[in-house]
Amino acid sequence: ERVFLDTWVGRQSHGLFWRHYRIAGEDGAALLYAVSIWVIMDIESRALTKDHAWAVVSRVTVEGELPAAFKSIPFPRELAERSSRRVTDTETDGNGHLNNCLYLRWGQDLLPEEFARTHALRSVWIEYRKELPRGTESELTYSLSGSTLYVRGTAENKERFLLRMEYDETV
């Protein structure tokens, strides 16, 4: 089966940049639509960039475009399980921080083996609070409640991220 990916720059506001993604089948029907919101930094100065001209390549209007909205996601205050993890060299991005996609791996690594074999990931929600630099030891508190994994990552007494992963049973 062939699929097609379209991506385009959306609006920008207060240093935030929207990027839209659409995956469609050969018949043109949308299989997936997503919006990501980015904050762009200068790597050397670690400051938000002031020159945003690069982000506006062209404006494209797509009918039915989803609005990007910040919604509060229910997240438990207390999580019973504990683990820890150190950010390794191979887990870092160009800024020297834990690569964004690896938060998911950290979450998946906490799942019981039987659960991981019998469930498929349905949805992910991540709230990044503060970066995790190379070598940082992070305390992970977590809980598997039904088919939802909740993970809170802290380091140096600061909350760094919240992760919620929802699963569907496959067997």
Language model: regions and residue ranges:
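HotDog/MaoC-like acyl-thioester-processing domains
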Residues: R2-F75, Y128-G135, S143-V171
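A short alpha-helix capping/helix-coil boundary motif
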Residues: S72, R82-S83
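Acidic/His-leaning functional-site neighborhoods
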Residues: L79, R85-Y167
